[in-house]
C-alpha cells in the first residue's frame, strides 16, 4: 500500500520511485493520496480506506502528512480540522510502533554512556489520540458516565467547576492492551533483548494500573518460561524511574510505553 503525503514528502517520494525503485523493480502498489487537500475532498475517507487496505495487504509505505491546526483551516479551505492520519491508521491497525535507532560509527549519542540501541515500543491505540474534549463554558460539573447495555450505570465526578475550563475523556480496550503486550514480549524474544514497561500506576490507579496488570498476567501465564530460556527479563517500573534508569544505562533493551508516552519518548 502506498500512502502519499504533503509538501516536500510528495516530491521526495516521487523522486525515490523514479530513480531508485521503478528502474529496477515492477512496483505494483495500491495507491492512496493522503495529502491534506485530498483528505478534505473525501471527508477523510481516504485515510480510512488506506488503513483497511494495509490490513488486507499487510505492508505499507506512508509519507509524512499534515495534521491541521487552526492556522491551516483557511490556508487549505478545510471543511473541518481533520484528525491525525497517523492516529487514525494506528487505531484501525491496532498495532505497536517499534522505533529502533540506527547506530552508525562516527555519530556519537547525546548520552555518552549509551552503547547499544534503545528500542521504543509504542502502543498504537487510544489515549489522547482517540480522546473527546470539551470547553467548559462556566460553573458546573463534568461527570464520567458508563451506561451498560442492560441500563446499569457507573458515574464518577470529574470536577466541579467554579468558572470556565476544559475537560478531556480518553479510553482504551483490554483487548488492544493484550495485543500490545504480546507484540512486545514476542519482539523481545525475537531480538533477545530485555523488555521494560513503565506507566504511572501510583497516580492512575485504574487506567494505568490496568496496563500494568495485563502485562504482568500475560507475562506470567505465557512468556516467563520463554524469557528464562532466552536469558532475558521483563521489568516493570514507574515512568519517571524508567527515565532516570535510561539515562544511566548502556542501552540494549526494549522500552514499552503507552501511546502518548511513546510519542514523547
Model-derived segments and their meaning:
Residues 5-6, 34, 65-66, 200-202, ...:
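Short, ordered loop/turn segments at secondary-structure junctions
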Amino acid at each position: 500500500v502506498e500512502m502519499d503525503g504533503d509538501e516536500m514528502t510528495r516530491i521526495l517520494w516521487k523522486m525515490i520511485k523514479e530513480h531508485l525503485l521503478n528502474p529496477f523493480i515492477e512496483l505494483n502498489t495500491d495507491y492512496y493520496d493522503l495529502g491534506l487537500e485530498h483528505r478534505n475532498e473525501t471527508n477523510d475517507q481516504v485515510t480510512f480506506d488506506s488503513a483497511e487496505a494495509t490490513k488486507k495487504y499487510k505492508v505499507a509505505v506512508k509519507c509524512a502528512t499534515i495534521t491541521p491546526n487552526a492556522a491551516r483551516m483557511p490556508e487549505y479551505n478545510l471543511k473541518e480540522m481533520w484528525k491525525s492520519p497517523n492516529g487514525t491508521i494506528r487505531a484501525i491497525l491496532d498495532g505497536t510502533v517499534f522505533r529502533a535507532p540506527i547506530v552508525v560509527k562516527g555519530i556519537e549519542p547525546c548520552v555518552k554512556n549509551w552503547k547499544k540501541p534503545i528500542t521504543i515500543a509504542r502502543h498504537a491505540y487510544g489515549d489522547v489520540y482517540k480522546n473527546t474534549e470539551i470547553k467548559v463554558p462556566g460553573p458546573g460539573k463534568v461527570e464520567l458516565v458508563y451506561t451498560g447495555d442492560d441500563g446499569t450505570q457507573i458515574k464518577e465526578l470529574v470536577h466541579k467547576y467554579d468558572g470556565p475550563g476544559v475537560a478531556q475523556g480518553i479510553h482504551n480496550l483490554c483487548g488492544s492492551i493484550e495485543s500490545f503486550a504480546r507484540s512486545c514480549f514476542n519482539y523481545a524474544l525475537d531480538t533477545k533483548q530485555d523488555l521494560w514497561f513503565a506507566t504511572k500506576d501510583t497516580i492512575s490507579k485504574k487506567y494505568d494500573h490496568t496496563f500494568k496488570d495485563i502485562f504482568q498476567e500475560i507475562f506470567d501465564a505465557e512468556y516467563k518460561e520463554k524469557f528464562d530460556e532466552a536469558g532475558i527479563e521483563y521489568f516493570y517500573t514507574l515512568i519517571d524511574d524508567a527515565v532516570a534508569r535510561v539515562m544511566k544505562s548502556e542501552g540494549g533493551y526494549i522500552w514499552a510505553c503507552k501511546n502518548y508516552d511513546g510519542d514523547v519518548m
